[in-house]
From Swiss-Prot:
Keywords: Chemotaxis, Cytokine, Disulfide bond, Glycoprotein, Secreted, Signal. Residues 1-19 form the signal peptide. Residues 116-127 have a biased composition (Basic and acidic residues). Its main location: secreted. It is found in: Secreted. Belongs to the intercrine beta (chemokine CC) family. Residues 92-127 are annotated as: Disordered. This is C-C motif chemokine 28. It comes from Homo sapiens.
Length: 127
């Protein structure tokens, strides 16, 4: 009889954990700080970029630049980055966005009782 009770409790715990996964946020890779300075020389080596919005999934607006195997988070208000994005858009003849918006993989808990661990990609550039 005790084994049957333990099995029922274990099953209930598994069901509760499975249901709570839909409520808890999926850990995302948001920038937690941004660099306000970036060199034009570094911008020449950018492979791709993404735009991170401060929309509830991430707390900070940023432009994420991918340089080799690094991600560099830069302020979207940075004048040098804005100019670079205009030049890149002109090179593409205005077709499509230079930097794509970051895709979100789920909704966050509205009361933010549990927050996923954010990865820090905010690098201060030595340039």
């Amino acid at each position: 009889m005790q084994q049957r009770g333990l099995a029922i409790v274990a099953l209930a715990v598994c069901a509760a954990l499975h249901a709570s996964e839909a409520i808890l946020p999926i850990a995302s890779s948001c920038c937690t700080e941004v660099s306000h300075h970036i060199s034009r020389r570094l911008l020449e080596r950018v492979n791709m970029c993404r735009i991170q919005r401060a929309d509830g999934d991430c707390d900070l607006a940023a432009v994420i630049l991918h340089v080799k195997r690094r991600r560099i988070c830069v302020s979207p208000h940075n004048h040098t980055v804005k100019q670079w994005m205009k030049v890149q858009a002109a090179k593409k003849n205005g077709k499509g966005n230079v930097c794509h918006r970051k895709k979100h993989h789920g909704k966050r808990n509205s009361n933010r009782a549990h927050q996923g661990k954010h990865e820090t990609y905010g690098h201060k550039t030595p340039y």
